[in-house]
Amino acid sequence: MLGRLARPLVRRLYHNRVVCAQKRLDERLDYGLANSTFYKRDTWIDRLLDDVEVQEAIKTSNKNNKYLSHLESGKKARIIAEEIIPSFNALFYLRVGYWFTRNILRLLYWVQVGYPHNKDSDKSYDKIKKNSSVIIVSNHRSNIDPFLLVYMAFRRSAISFSAGEWAKGWPMQQLIHAIGFYIIRRKKTDPLYRCILKRYVHMAVSECVPQGIFIEGALSKNGAMRPAHLGLLNYQIRAMNDGKCKDIVFIPAAINYDKFPEDVSLFEQIANHKKEFRNRNRFFSRLALIGFLFRLITYIFPRKYKPFGCAAVNFGEPLLLSEWQEQQSVNLKDVGEIERRKLVGCLGKTLTDRINSIMPITPMAIIATVILKNQSGRLASSDIKSLANDLLESLSRLKSNMLIAKKDISFSLEQAIYILRKQKIISRGKNNDYYVEQSRKKLLEYYANSINHLVKK
């Protein structure tokens, strides 16, 4: 009896807290929350399943598979929609998600942010109109990338990113959905799945829900940027001038780390020609996550260096799709499919080049470049620092790209050397000089490759 009375009361109290959190978050963010953020998840799902293209895809799926009835095809579509569509919870986002992300990142890194092409810091983003859909376009180096970008953009807007197969399964799926991320299967070729994903992305952009995409489509395998993967980008730009979206604004974001959590396992998979993370057994993926969380406990105690060094994000100049179309003298909605693909590829290349041009120059990348250039002999710590300073001087034209912990170059370089030693990428000899462990040389090359295109200029 007491339980029956208490349950509605608890629900009501929780609902009031969520509404209060939504209002506070809406007031705190410079761009506020999109109106569609306040829709219930079931509303999104019903709207998506009622979409004309989705209904046609369900009928086609039913025709192509004689063993599925129309009702079963509809159920399959609902399961797909429920897997993709997030259930944004402002209370969780504000009280748990942001707090947890901020503290974990600060525990692991010196977090740095820069605006290389803008002397007035981030004021150029004040020109973005509210009826524009904002899309942060970034490179992809780690599975913590979206959390780093959400943390950096927290004052501005709540960003909805796509998460891959690693986020499937309890409890990750529920947590990822609660902070507004949608989950996708990147290699899924089922036409029904692709149609539902396409229409969801179209709906979200047309409702001006801020988005984030990783233009490479997967983690970098060698430290350098991959060619642009155009699937989600193509879906997003189709929403131009639909619904509330009067323009699409792309904001380039370049991410770089001294070290990231899965670098060693990624390197081992590539070296052994194994399949990517998504194909790993879920049990072992969860086990690895639990192991990482336990290791975090050891990082709580005060220490001179951050365990993973610097994490840096540079934001570039916004690119308006309307202005880009004017420059190209074209309207993407008026061209044929073949011509459209070429133009989307051109847009992807433009965004990739912008990201590469603002790539953060981290201490680890500098040290790795210096050691690889002088790998024939051993180097003392003082020699490494001297050569690193010479390289930094030669890159002075890119000073705005350089993000240094505590604004102390010497400290940052020492920290990078400390991390390399801890990872056993370099070792100290009898004469206190350093040499590269050949078995881990590829990891050193990985970090150097992130700025190789800048060093060569």
Residue ranges of predicted features:
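Membrane-interfacial terminal anchoring regions of lipid-handling membrane enzymes
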Residues: 1-212, 217-457
